Swiss-Prot record:
Monomer. Dimer. Gene3D superfamilies: DD-peptidase/beta-lactamase superfamily (3.40.710.10). A beta-lactam binds at residues 70, 73, 118, 250. Induction: Expressed from an upstream promoter, P(out), in an insertion sequence IS1999. It catalyses: a beta-lactam + H2O = a substituted beta-amino acid. It comes from Klebsiella pneumoniae. Pfam families: Transpeptidase. One of its GO terms (biological process) is cell wall organization. PANTHER family: BETA-LACTAMASE YBXI-RELATED, PEPTIDOGLYCAN D,D-TRANSPEPTIDASE. GO terms for molecular function: beta-lactamase activity; penicillin binding. This is Beta-lactamase OXA-48. Changing residue 189 to A: No significant effect on catalytic efficiency with respect to ampicillin. Very little reduction in dimerization at neutral pH. Predominantly monomer at neutral pH. Slightly decreases thermal stability.
Length: 265
């Protein structure tokens, strides 16, 4: 059984706005070394589902809200499925023929591949078909971040008013994992399938990356969870990312923390 082997002396604090089930969060500043090593700043938040405990390296930043960027593909997918904008994970979305800088976008996709390759144009079309009224209603039902969809309906998560913190990401993900969001269990199951990132004999990771570039500060995200035989660990990390050169650090730093705490080998 994997137990969190926290190697530092913890500061226990109650923080308003963190997941309602969490009365005490523990801070481990030793995790900061993983950011310092890569000359960056950021936060990692972990949640032990069995013990109902939260851990982070930076309590203040854990509660600071940023644009969700492409992590918003998780709620966008759920809403599109539940409203029938997307029939299922097999429906094909035809490439519009416009050549874009990211080569993997320049082809047909289904929900699984659109999530995997973070295909913005596909998700913008989802949002346009969902519309402002239904999008706003669903995000309120999800209690997703500040629920503010001001800006364009097909880009508010990239350059509009919506903001979400790492701890709020954890709250949302926990509801998704337990099929407790206000959409069908089928919709939640399909999205969790689309989030599959890594699977081996030790663990399964379901997650989504994000990279906010249109509004300063530019932020990189990785949010999701680690499924073990006897527990689930939720995670949400964001970090300063002035250029795209460090995109791989989102996963690398998170995994360094998970390994430090002996959650993954």
């Amino acid at each position: 059984m994997r137990v969190l082997a926290l190697s530092a002396v913890f500061l226990v604090a109650s923080i308003i706005g963190m997941p309602a089930v969490a009365k005490e969060w523990q801070e481990n500043k030793s995790w900061n070394a993983h950011f310092t090593e890569h000359k960056s700043q950021g936060v990692v938040v972990l949640w032990n589902e069995n013990k109902q405990q939260g851990f982070t390296n930076n309590l203040k930043r854990a509660n600071q809200a940023f644009l969700p960027a492409s992590t918003f593909k998780i709620p966008n997918s759920l809403i599109a499925l539940d409203l029938g904008v997307v029939k299922d994970e097999h429906q094909v979305f035809k490439w519009d023929g416009q050549t874009r800088d990211i080569a993997t976008w320049n082809r047909d996709h289904n929900l699984i591949t659109a999530m995997k390759y973070s295909v913005v144009p596909v998700y913008q079309e989802f949002a346009r078909q969902i519309g402002e009224a239904r999008m706003s209603k669903m995000l309120h039902a999800f209690d997703y971040g500040n629920e503010d969809i001001s800006g364009n309906v097909d880009s508010f998560w990239l350059d509009g008013g919506i903001r979400i913190s790492a701890t709020e990401q954890i709250s949302f993900l926990r509801k998704l994992y337990h099929n407790k969001l206000h959409v069908s269990e089928r919709s939640q199951r399909i999205v969790k399938q689309a989030m599959l990132t890594e699977a081996n004999g030790d663990y399964i990771i379901r997650a989504k990356t994000g990279y906010s570039t249109r509004i300063e500060p530019k932020i990189g995200w990785w949010v999701g969870w680690v499924e073990l035989d006897d527990n689930v660990w939720f995670f949400a990390m964001n970090m300063d990312m002035p250029t795209s050169d460090g995109l791989g650090l989102r996963q690398a730093i998170t995994k360094e923390v998970l390994k430090q705490e002996k959650i993954i080998p």
